[in-house]
Amino acid sequence: MDPYKNRPSSAFNSPFWTTNSGAPIWNNNSSLTVGSRGPILLEDYHLVEKLANFDRERIPERVVHARGASAKGFFEVTHDISHLTCADFLRAPGVQTPLIVRFSTVIHERGSPETLRDPRGFAVKFYTREGNFDLVGNNFPVFFVRDGLKFPDMVHALKPNPKSHIQENWRILDFFSHHPESLHMFSFLFDDVGIPQDYRHMDGFGVNTYTLINKAGKALYVKFHWKTTSGEKSLLDDEAIRVGGSNHSHATQDLYDSIAAGNYPEWKLYIQTLDPENEDRLDFDPLDVTKTWPEDVLPLQPVGRMVLNKNIDNFFAENEQLAFCPAIIVPGVYYSDDKLLQTRVFSYADTQRHRLGPNYLQLPANAPKCAHHNNHHDGFMNFMHRDEEVNYFPSRYDPVRHAEKVPVPPRILGGKREKCMIEKENNFKQPGERYRSWPSDRQERFVRRWVDALSDPRVTHEIRSIWISYWSQADRSLGQKIASHLNLKPSI
């Protein structure tokens, strides 16, 4: 008997009620009691099983990105970049790869409104012929901090107060007052784009710097960009209040209903590439996740398109159990020394093992569609059917061999072991340029949001002064406007 042909699924349904083990249930309306009013008997195994399963339906929610929605579709290469990467799924125009995408809010809980001012997750899992590739990003091209060592504290500051369970501005502004590199991220979060209209009308970014390697072993730094063909749209503050007040799942519903109606959302994929030999020509570190790469110097190159044309079949199986990790790459794509990426490579898989168990990659949404082979076996909830006798390597009884070697970045590393900051921080230039690119009404809304945040009564004079100093260094007039609204004098 093939156990996979008889696994529980919607395609293999009994016409009558059964227990988990398949025994028929003739009454799913009444418990087994002594007489019509007597006590319930412990031998009512159906009742015990039903309650025990119900008691364990919920799993730990994600620490971040708990609130999300998923959809399935495909990626199609439209432009040849085979000279830049040997990745099989990017080998030629016309090649299609199935995928699943999860959009999410970041900080708030699983049932929170989708209209809160918060970054949005934009995670894509490509099911390629060479294994899965997880491109795990956000709807903003930068991040709050550049070193993953700060990530737990950053999340703690953004999350609700552990005493009151209320998200409070004074905690956020206190923490980030120690991290001026966060200004660029706040220039997105407190901007109009801080609340996307829905998931279909937002762009996505890989955020971190990765590496592309071609067949000759040539390595280039790369940034990934998703551009929605529906146009980027956002909600202003009063619109967000109105939409969230009528439907706290508006973005999830919009995505689901659009796909069900045949209005398939689409994104174009672009890349920016940089030869590592030329990185010193920039006035910032290209591995600094708080920076964007100037498109006039490093132009966007089209790669392909992503179309979401199928809704998920089950929210728990294909959204809650869907797991991403930036460590999951394919030949032709590699990591960089981006300090945030380096820590994400470990942390994402680690949190999935805690949340879903050590065999989470066997779950259908996470498992590769291609053939795979290793000796990782057993452990909690291992449900892969295996019948081999050789579970070690190498062996003369098992013909499995090493795969063909693939190119990796041929970089020579050197230096002392030390904990230090990067040399070219340049924290203020890009947020200032971004602010000056806006029309006056957009600038005024940005100023107002900062004034509201800094008006929290628990924000001290010192913290307000630090933020005014930061924004003054980004743009003198911006700092002056914020200070004027707060009846303070800018320090520079």
Curated annotation (Swiss-Prot):
UniProt keyword annotation of Oxidoreductase present: yes
Cystine residue pairs: none
Known cofactor(s): heme
Record protein name field: Catalase-1/2
Gene3D superfamilies for this protein: Catalase core domain (2.40.180.10)
Organism: Glycine max (Soybean)
Pfam family, one: Catalase
Record keywords, A-Z: Cytoplasm, Heme, Hydrogen peroxide, Iron, Metal-binding, Oxidoreductase, Peroxidase, Peroxisome
EC number: 1.11.1.6
